[in-house]
Design a protein with these regions (language model features):
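A compositional/biophysical signature of low hydrophobicity enriched in polar/charged and small residues
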Residues: 1-149
Length: 149
């Protein structure tokens, strides 16, 4: 990664232009052509440095329910459990952790009732009964910017 890549990553985290030609505008800011910016973004995506470019929305204000789930999954069931959980498009994150509760994942769905239904389905499909439903009571921070300079 060179200085232009780092500058590009800094810009697109929170300063992505909402215009007809955002990559052109990024190029102007970074003294590059639109095509060079597009080439760099594609390369950074291929390398897995950029996962996605898109908006972040306040799910609560849009009427969605969210929760953090912690599951106690026996080692021999981990693969199946992960596959079942990942089938749900409402799952936004899914992590293996070194803890008694070793799988942690988040749900964002139309209602908390729907989340409970999905959790019941996951329990039935995997045989894992110990899944904690930990909805947030208060959000203290949800944004992170990585300063790459």
């Amino acid at each position: 990664m060179d200085d232009v890549d780092r500058g590009l990553l800094n810009e697109i985290q929170t300063g992505f232009p909402i215009t007809g030609r955002p990559f052109h505008d990024l190029g102007v800011r970074l003294n590059c052509s639109e095509e060079e910016i597009l080439t760099r973004v594609r390369r950074l995506k291929r390398k897995g440095i950029i996962r996605r470019i898109g908006g972040n929305f306040d799910s609560k204000r849009l009427g969605f329910a969210t929760t953090l789930c912690a599951a106690r999954v026996p080692e021999e069931k981990i693969r199946k459990f992960i596959k079942v959980v990942n089938r749900y498009p409402e799952v936004t994150h899914n992590y293996l952790r070194d803890n008694r509760y070793n799988i942690w994942f988040t749900f964002v769905a139309r209602s908390s009732e729907l989340i409970c239904r999905y959790m019941k389905e996951i329990k039935e499909q995997t045989g894992v009964k110990e899944i904690l439903n930990l909805p947030a009571v208060k959000i203290f921070k949800i944004l992170v910017d990585f300063d790459l300079d």
